[in-house]
Amino acid sequence: MQRTNFGEMACSIARTLDVIGEPWSPLILRDVFVGFTRFEQIQADLGVSRKVLTERLHHLVERGVLERRPYDRRPRYEYVLTEKGAELVDVLMVMVGWGDKWLAGEAGPPVLYRHHACGEISRGDLRCAHCGEPMHAGDVDVLPGPGAG
């Protein structure tokens, strides 16, 4: 079955889906954002097959969202967010806010974010609920929330 090429549509949402629309891609970006930068770490956290993870990482590197950097002599590689990828974290944070509001359940959100600028705990959002400052990749520490289980 041929996948639709969203990248050629005259729509920014469709073009963004062409980059992160595969089911594992947003979760891989989330993992890299929270500090799982090595293949084995990402695979262990997500439980995704090596083949699928390899394909997704290659796609995200090819699209300029992740950068592949050697970290050992073998060589082995880790994956880091590029500027383009760090800005996609803002999209993920909007998804977190929606999911926390509509899908978290009685226990509450599974993840909380400590904003570096003010030190306060905030939920997933583009702005800190306490100081109102923007929250981007690198501006927060990720902590287990009450719904982490």
What are these regions, as identified by a protein language model?
Residues 1-8:
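N-terminal intrinsically disordered/low-complexity leader segments
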Residues 11-49:
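N-terminal helix-turn-helix DNA-binding core of bacterial DNA-binding proteins
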Residues 52:
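Residues in the helix-turn-helix
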Residues 100-149:
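C-terminal regulatory/oligomerization modules of transcriptional regulators
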Residues 21, 72-94:
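Basic, amphipathic "hinge/linker" alpha-helix immediately C-terminal to the N-terminal HTH DNA-binding motif
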Residues 26, 63, 91-102:
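Alpha-helical linker/hinge and terminal dimerization helices associated
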Residues 61-77:
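Beta-hairpin "wing" of winged helix-turn-helix
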Residues 56:
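Residues within the DNA-recognition helix of helix-turn-helix
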